[in-house]
Design a protein with these regions (language model features):
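Charged, amphipathic alpha-helical segments and their flanking helix caps
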Residues: 1-16, 24-27, 33-114
Length: 114
C-alpha cells in the first residue's frame, strides 16, 4: 500500500504520520489518505492527500511546508515519482482545528498495489 510507504517515509523524517487520528494525538501530526488510484501497464498512479494538524494556523502551514519538501525531494525506493498537485488551508471552521492539506500524485511500479 502506497499509504504505508508514505507513512514510513514521514515517520523516518520525524513527522508523526497516521492513516487516522490517533486517540492520543500530539499537538502536531499528519493524516495520510489515498483519494484515488489508476493503473495501467504495471504503473500505478495514486492521489494522496496529507492533512497537517497543528495548534495554530501558522504551525499547520509550517508543517505543511515540511511535508511538501519531504515528499517532492524524496528518493524512496518504490515511489517512482511524486508531484505536488495543490495545497491549501483546510481549517475546520466549526471546531477551530487548524489544518493544511497537500495533495500529491504518486507513481509506483506496481499494478493495483500488490
Amino acid at each position: 500500500m502506497v499509504e504505508s510507504e508514505i507513512i514510513k517515509l514521514l515517520n523516518s523524517k520525524g513527522i508523526k504520520a497516521y492513516m487516522e487520528r490517533p486517540k492520543d494525538a500530539s499537538d502536531e501530526y499528519v493524516i495520510v489518505e489515498k483519494t484515488g488510484t489508476a493503473s495501467k501497464d504495471w504503473v500505478t498512479i495514486s492521489t494522496i492527500a496529507i492533512k497537517s494538524h497543528a495548534p495554530s494556523l501558522l504551525k499547520a502551514a509550517q508543517l505543511n511546508e515540511k511535508i511538501k519538501k519531504i515528499m517532492v525531494y524524496t528518493s524512496e525506493r518504490g515511489l517512482s515519482s511524486i508531484r505536488l498537485i495543490n495545497d491549501y488551508n483546510f481549517t475546520n471552521i466549526s471546531t477551530k482545528e487548524y489544518r493544511y492539506q497537500a495533495v500529491f500524485s504518486v507513481v509506483t511500479r506496481q499494478f493495483m498495489e500488490e
